[in-house]
Amino acid sequence: MTQVSMRDLFEAGAHFGHRARFWNPKMAPYIYGKRGDIHIINLEQTVPMLNDALNFLSAVVGNGGRVMFVGTKRSASDAISEAASRCGMPYVNFRWLGGMMTNFKTIRQSIRRLEEIEKMAEDGTYDKLSKKEVIVLEREREKLARALTGIRSMKHLPDVLFVVDVGHERIAIQEAMKLGIPVVGVVDTNNDIEGVDYIIPGNDDSVRAIRLYVNAAADTIEHAKAAAAVRGGDNAEEELAEAISQEEPSAAEELPDDMADNENEFE
């Protein structure tokens, strides 16, 4: 499994929190001190907590679970989509639509609407419409695509949320809490830890730090999927061998009746 060191975090600037006057007292256990007016996050706490979170993701994915990456602010958007796409997981990186999980049926309808418009563009339907109608449809398509691209192939609710900036993504966390979905979250010094099951104390604004978190998660997920595939292959071979052994007749069964009774005559 991927391991992130204190040096990795330090070099990415993960230790820089927010201005002290904006702090959330619930983050006090994870704050080392202040540099000027900036809170400094205790990376000695972050390292084991991040690795615990990665272990959790590995266990979930190893058992066939799905992780949804969530990070919609500008500094996180690209990193979220790239990391999630690389490890084959759903993501939300533009805007969290209210009810994206708690009203998933409606979201699926929106995805079908997006697919319907795309089909219209491809099958020649646009050619039969007025220019104004095409413009309206294209605007709708662009709006839906921005919000839904990362979850288009998601048929079921995720098993875990991996969130960058839990304050910015508070609605997503509230929905996860309602549904009992565990949350792994990067929590800066100004945010509330409520609803976050696996806390990763760290800078949630630095692009470099964000890439470190999400790439570590993606690497962990890829390794877990590969390990699960190997286990599945091994199990498949064992099951096949067992099935064959059950179907094959014993040596005595293969012998003619008049010889079966004498099969051990040379022992």
UniProtKB/Swiss-Prot annotation:
Q: Which terms does the UniProt entry file under GO BP?
A: translation
Q: Gene name on record?
A: rpsB
Give the organism's phylogenetic lineage.
Bacteria, Pseudomonadati, Pseudomonadota, Gammaproteobacteria, Cardiobacteriales
Top-rank taxon: Bacteria
InterPro entries given in the database record: Ribosomal_uS2, Ribosomal_uS2_bac/mit/plastid, Ribosomal_uS2_CS, Ribosomal_uS2_flav_dom_sf
Organism this protein belongs to = Dichelobacter nodosus (strain VCS1703A)
Compositionally biased intervals (Acidic residues): 250-267
Q: Which CDD domains match?
A: RPS2
Q: What is this protein called?
A: Small ribosomal subunit protein uS2
Any one annotated GO CC term: cytosolic small ribosomal subunit
List the Gene Ontology MF annotations in alphabetical order: structural constituent of ribosome
